[in-house]
């Protein structure tokens, strides 16, 4: 107990006063009382390691310094960044000019920055990974989420650290390698679980797993196999794998997982995603660019309920090893947005984020996910300055988006830093997609590691300073790591469930019971997300409903079984769910009770600690005060003893008396204190007894609630008694203090009195010592007497001393004695007090021990009470949960019982309905049977009458019967015919012979027969109606039976629970058999009635009735209640019909009686004599009828043949449709193949473009090499300026032509590609239209098939009816043959009439049939025409498609030819380089020859100079080789600049994307490979004759020579003046004109001495020409413009490209001299002796004017130059 109560290890102070006093603490800390217990108790379940690492939750920042490049080492290697130690860096202010290129300037000289870790430029990728990334990887394996992102300038090495190269891989491939090597056999290879949203997961079905594997294989097919370099495998085999060995990994898993998990069963599923944020829009890098629109699908950033951000529809891919992950990384890098900038060749233009998510799965019988962790590695794009990058267009927009996103990141970090100190501020996470994605990590998802990349170059000083300042603010941001703990809780709550899926998550949300007593436990983390879960459940329910709705009538039994099984499954699932929920509730209650117990124990421990501290402090204060009082008392007593020792006047008896008095007084004073202690001891014993009784009572108690109540009451009483005892103790201690203080005050007063008395005694003693000796005896005797008197009085004996005899002396002595007695009493009282104090201390220690024991007993009792209370609460909660469960079960049982009752009621109602319907069916069948029997009886009676009556009447009656039976709907016609029959009978000639009486009788007889037949017709009509009603009832019965079956299925589930349902099922089966029997009987009867009732003429009516019936049945299906009402009405109608039938039966009986009478009357008139003539006529009519029947048979045969033909045609159409469908499928397959081919072609086209760009880059690199070579050549080729200018001119023309050709080809290819895309889209639309037309054709054909089937059925029906009529006709023939002897002529007339009517009806039916056939044939023709048109359209589209395919093939061939041409051009470039090397060697040999010739010419010049002094002025115009040599040297110096400018131009064109050729490239004009293309203008001049120039046009066969005047030489004084002016001008020119570095001009020492002379000073005469005549001077002044000025005019009127190039040449000719002047400024103060140089104004000195405006003198006469200008102007008018 004490170890728990005192965790700091401080010994608990004892309450014994005799123990040594403990040193009192200086300050008492009461902050523990004011602690926020809710905050501390929320961390009870968390790990102690997490609490210990709470101080490490700040954002970790690591710095990596990029080493210098080769160019930076040469120019910027000042060392601005200096690494002090492993955690600090010093940034120095650069002293060079490059460091201050920006407008800002730092005021500090050096600044120090500290980081979590600093990695210098010499650190390798492996060391950086070990020092910075290894710990987050370990945390990932332990189940935590981490974020790592790089930050820095562009070109600072972020992507290199992130990805690395193939030789030296970066942190991302290394993390993958370490991850998979540490997991090894613990990988979960199945794809049953997939990550979802931020921290969730989905359970996949088998089909979904197949889809995931197919998607993965398609992704891996897009990129080839990637081989990782050996360094990465060294990493795996070396230190990294040792750092994460398998036992350590298992220990980490043990530490991070729950206690219930088995470490051997835990496996890991690794999933990977890769996306980028480009221009504030998110793209998945695993998804390639779509081939149709060249666009990528944008993804949406969203948040879950807890505010954690995730990317919707992001593709997650499961990875099984590091190679697959590396291949996916390469695939994403291939799709990443990268561009070329001035500072970086491959600058990433987006923020790319590679995420690794690990699912920890317990691989048991039912696998479940225990934890989800992720590692996000973000490669941020670098911040850029547009001044330095010089971006334009799309690059500038990208840079703006990158800078804004980084700026918002800085804002968010600054706000997070400030919000810790001040109030909570709004963090602008939503201002950019990057910060919105990082929001979840900044708000507690996981720790963050930030990698700062900087460069050491001086030019980026300001940017590095800003980056380092940003890193200092980022280090102060606190990042909470709350997701791991909440995730542990969430996954621990789901531990007991077997299936951790979406359903379980939903159950968690629905039944997540919270405890009200602990309010701080209700946090947002326990709220589960169920948006997608509810959607999935709704979808499942919808699919189940759809499946139940789409059941057929044929599969009734299977449906019943399925429903029974589903109901059983549902019940089982519900029971399992209830059990799981019960277990979960019990577990949660246990956990919460344990939490409450822990909380209460901690509270009680803290309270007891606080109380013990208070008691110890109080006792220490008392001890301290007592010690002070005792010290003061001892000091005063010592003083008093000293005083008393000096006084010897008093005796010992007085002291004794005083002691006795003091003892008595002190005893009286301390009686109260001893009584208090005794009473306290009695109270303690009473408390002990009460505690023992309470304990016994608690043990004896049975009801825990009553026991707890009693204990609480007694506990309160004990507390009150303890408080009273404490108050009494405090009062007693106060009284003791007061009494001691009073006694001390009295002692002080007495001591002061004693002092005064001692002083007075001393004075008296001195006086008495002077008294005489004789008086001593007397005083001695008197003293003895006094002593005796005192002894007699009972006083103690006095001390020896002198006593005055006088009465005042005796009084003083008495006072002294009293004082001595009082002092002795005080001393004895002190001694007694000390003894009593010791006794009291001993008693207090005993009481304190007893109090401690009592406290311990009380604590134990409190614990028992708390445990009992907890048990009570637990049992109450159990009871409540059980009650809730019981209530739920009872409610479910009640609902089930109610459903059973409702279903029973429904079943009973249905049974009643079935019984009623069966009764109605029985009654209807009986009525029908009775009617049929009555009709049969009537027919027999009529036959008897016929046998009695004449054969003519019998034939009439038979015909009428047949006619009535055949035509049920045409009753009126039959009545008319029956009415016309008697008229016809009596109109005949042979009837007139009979008497009038017989006529009247016959009329009455016929009338009665007609009435009978009318009644029979009505009966037949009623029977037909009843048959229709019976059909409707049958259909309704069928529907009701379907419903009954559904209800039976539901009832079967409930009857399975009950034992009484078996008998009912048997009854239902019996009833079903009865109903089936009734159906069969009804069907037979209905067939018999339909055969009698239906006719050929009623086809259309039957069709209309059928359509009406269909609509009626649909309406009846929708409204069952209306059907029930109609059934009731029909039952009533049946009753009415039965009554009418009974009435008619009575009428028939009456008629039968009348018939009998008529038969008796007409027996005499049966036999006649004219039967022979009637028989002849009857035979003739029979022959006619036979002929007619033969014709009808032929017609029917023809119709049957036509039907067969139509069937054959329909079969053909079906076959054609099948063929068309097969063709369409083939076409679809071809289209898919063609689309794949197009996609492959596009990829090849993109690869070709990339290859072209690579070739262009190689060309630019080769141009750089050519530049270096040219610099070397230019040092040797100082005399080849004119030749190089010619080459430049030719090169420009070649470039123009080639650019035009390349642009035209590219435009044509692009146009063709666009056309192909458009054609493909049009074809796709046409194919879709074709599909629609085919679907419509199929529908129409199906409708036609239906119509044909209906018509074929009608034809069959007609054929059956014809057969029946034939049979009837045969019967008639037989009857007629039998009754030939009894027939009459009137019967023949009637038969002819009836036969004519039948013929008319047959003709009408044939006409209708023909009209229907015509309509059908027309529809068939229309359909055939439509099908033919569709086939034609499809053929056309197929042809177009074939043509487009041929075009695509052609385009592909052209692309291949272009690639072949590129390869040829590369080979030609190599050939040209070889030729160039050969030319260089040839030029070197020529230069040597020229140098030797120049030496020879110098000698000749010296000779000529000697001769020139003697010669005339005309000889001055001759050529001087020495200045030409110098001029040629100057020109050679100038040559480097135009070439460099040409290189700059070629670079610029290469950057724009067009192919740029160099000045010496090979041209392939007219197929023959020539060194240079055909020039537009050829200019030839040699350094030997610089004043002559040969110009040749393409049309002219011979060149035209042009003479150029020479400039005169200057004197030495003028040369010096010109030098000074040139220096002034060069110093005045701005610095910005310098374009080339100094290193380019170090190797030209001749240029340092060249000075430019511009203006009129260049027109002065040289010293060598001083002797020339005035004529030559005038000629020189007239020809002031030199060759270069004329050359500028010549180029001004040339084509625009030549003008622009000429401008750059003229500008560059001035710039290098200025740069040389700057370099040689230091040497200006000490100029060397300049050699005598011959300056020329025309060629060597550059003109400081613009390229467009060239000044020249106006000349009246048109020179040869102007003629050339005009010609060139007209030629370049294009």
From Swiss-Prot:
Protein name: Kinesin-like protein KIF20B
Entry similarity comment: Belongs to the TRAFAC class myosin-kinesin ATPase superfamily. Kinesin family.
Compositional bias annotation for Basic and acidic residues: 779-788, 1638-1651
Kinesin motor domain ranges (all copies): 58-477
Effect of residue 1048 to A: Reduces interaction with SHTN1
Biased composition (Acidic residues): 538-555
Functional description taken from the UniProt entry: Plus-end-directed motor enzyme that is required for completion of cytokinesis. Required for proper midbody organization and abscission in polarized cortical stem cells. Plays a role in the regulation of neuronal polarization by mediating the transport of specific cargos. Participates in the mobilization of SHTN1 and in the accumulation of PIP3 in the growth cone of primary hippocampal neurons in a tubulin and actin-dependent manner.
One GO CC term on file: midbody
Gene Ontology MF, one: ATP binding
Region of interest: Interaction with PIN1: 1514-1774
Positions carrying Phosphoserine: 486, 950, 1107, 1542, 1612, 1669, 1694
CDD domains listed in its UniProt record: KISc_KIF23_like, RBD_KIF20B
Any GO BP: regulation of establishment of cell polarity
Residues annotated to bind ATP: 152-159
Bias (Polar residues): 741-778
Primary residence: nucleus
Region spans: Disordered: 538-557, 740-799, 1625-1663
Region (Necessary and sufficient for interaction with SHTN1): 1002-1059
SUPFAM superfamilies assigned to the protein according to its UniProt record, in alphabetical order: P-loop containing nucleoside triphosphate hydrolases
Keyword annotations from UniProtKB, A to Z: ATP-binding, Cell cycle, Cell division, Cell projection, Coiled coil, Cytoplasm, Cytoskeleton, Microtubule, Mitosis, Motor protein, Nucleotide-binding, Nucleus, Oncogene, Phosphoprotein
Tissues of expression: Expressed in the brain (at protein level).
Subunit structure: Oligomerizes (via kinesin motor domain). Associates with microtubules. Interacts (via C-terminal globular tail region) with PIN1 (via WW domain). Interacts with PRC1. Interacts with SHTN1 (via N-terminus); the interaction is direct and promotes the association of SHTN1 to microtubules in primary neurons. Associates with microtubules.
Post-translational note: Phosphorylated during mitosis by CDK1.
Residues where Phosphothreonine is found: 1598
Coiled coil: 525-601, 705-747, 824-946, 1021-1507
Intracellular or extracellular location(s): Nucleus; Cytoplasm, Cytoskeleton; Cytoplasm, Cytoskeleton, Microtubule organizing center, Centrosome; Nucleus, Nucleolus
